[in-house]
């Protein structure tokens, strides 16, 4: 029996007992049976309570392979760190902030290895009362994205309000037009109306709460009233028919064709939100609740992958220097930023300094109604 020098578990936030990992284990081994017990509760939703519990079942002692050491890799290891699974000496951090800081500080004559990595910008929007009111719930009347985009079959329960939201993001919401005319160039930049975004956000990922919501959005985008979106190929990456893993990636690239000449919108409630790379994605719209920073930032960082090409002389051209996160629940967005920046940096003890370092490289623009 082979004793390996090291076993590397990538995407550790995602668990070690998924179907792909299990296929490498001896099916007669008790560990395989233990893994099978959790399979039925693994879902598309990377943040669901049951799925998190299933992933926590993993135990090195059950691994049917012998090794001298383990290396766990994750871009969002919040639960592993907060649970005390690893002591401080076992943790090495290289975060988004470190990467962007290294990119800016690069002074060598050698090519900058970080130059391709886009800088992320977050824009949060407090929706007008006339749109938000239908989904204000709870003790503090917080805007509930899951309620707002709730759907059955392929129809939104609040379709009238979702249509208002679509009008808003493309700059044609009538209740805002007079105010925006007064503001002129100071009006909030919406993802599908601001000229700075229109040519840049050719391919976006919309993160919705359910398969039904994805199908409902696809149907709504194809209505004559939304003729603006007819230029975009809409991909529903949700449900069993969308495929799993790499099979869910192929339809997206097929729809893009030559991504510099096409436009796409990918609708998903979990597929393609972790462990995959779709280079032409330049923006993500966060359209679902998420109390888990793992789920939130795994999805957000899907749009931060580098995208380059070669010019006629063979020189590298960076096509994506920036990428964007659009969030319509400002309080939730800021809470996620606070948790991400504070939980990953175990060396710094001052939370304000942790957040300050993070937003130095991830600027956040917050819009309330028609003002920043």
Positions of predicted regions on the chain:
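Conserved C-terminal RecA-like helicase domain
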Residues: 1-3, 23-24, 30, 142-268
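Catalytic P-loop NTPase motifs of RecA-like helicase/translocase cores
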Residues: 15-18, 79-80, 293, 306
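Conserved RecA-like P-loop NTPase helicase motor core
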Residues: 229, 233-348
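Non-catalytic, charged low-complexity extensions flanking SF2 helicase motor domains
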Residues: 345-372
């Amino acid at each position: 029996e082979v004793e390996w020098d090291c076993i590397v578990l990538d995407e550790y936030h995602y668990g070690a007992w998924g179907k792909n990992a299990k296929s490498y284990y001896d099916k007669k081994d008790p560990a395989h049976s233990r893994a099978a017990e959790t399979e039925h509760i693994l879902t598309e939703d990377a943040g669901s309570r049951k799925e998190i519990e299933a992933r926590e079942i993993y135990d090195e002692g059950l691994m049917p392979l012998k090794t001298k050491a383990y290396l766990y890799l994750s871009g969002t290891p919040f639960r592993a760190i907060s649970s005390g699974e690893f002591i401080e000496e076992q943790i090495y951090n290289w975060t988004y902030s470190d990467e962007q800081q290294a990119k800016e500080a690069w002074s060598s004559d050698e090519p900058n290895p970080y130059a391709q990595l886009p800088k992320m910008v977050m824009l949060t929007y407090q929706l007008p009362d006339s749109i938000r009111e239908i989904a204000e719930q709870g003790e503090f009347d917080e805007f509930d994205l899951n309620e707002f985009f709730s759907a059955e079959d392929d129809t939104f329960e609040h379709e009238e309000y979702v249509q208002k939201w679509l009008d808003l993001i493309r700059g044609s919401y009538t209740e805002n037009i007079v105010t925006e005319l007064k503001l002129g160039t100071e009006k909030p930049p919406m993802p599908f109306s601001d000229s700075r975004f229109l040519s840049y956000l050719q391919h976006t990922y919309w993160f919705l709460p359910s398969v039904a919501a994805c199908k409902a959005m696809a149907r709504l985008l194809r209505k004559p009233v939304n003729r603006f979106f007819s230029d975009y190929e809409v991909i529903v990456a949700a449900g069993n028919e969308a495929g799993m893993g790499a099979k869910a990636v192929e339809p997206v690239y097929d729809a893009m064709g030559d991504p510099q000449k096409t436009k796409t919108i990918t609708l998903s409630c979990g597929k393609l939100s972790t462990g995959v790379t779709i280079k032409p994605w330049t923006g993500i719209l966060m359209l679902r609740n998420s109390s888990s920073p793992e789920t939130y930032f795994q999805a957000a960082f899907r749009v931060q992958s580098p995208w380059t090409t070669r010019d006629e002389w063979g020189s590298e051209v960076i096509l994506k220097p920036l990428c964007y996160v659009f969030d319509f629940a400002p309080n939730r967005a800021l809470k996620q930023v606070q948790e991400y920046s504070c939980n990953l940096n175990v060396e710094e003890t001052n939370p304000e300094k942790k957040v300050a370092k993070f937003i130095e490289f991830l600027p956040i623009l917050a819009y309330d109604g028609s003002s920043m």
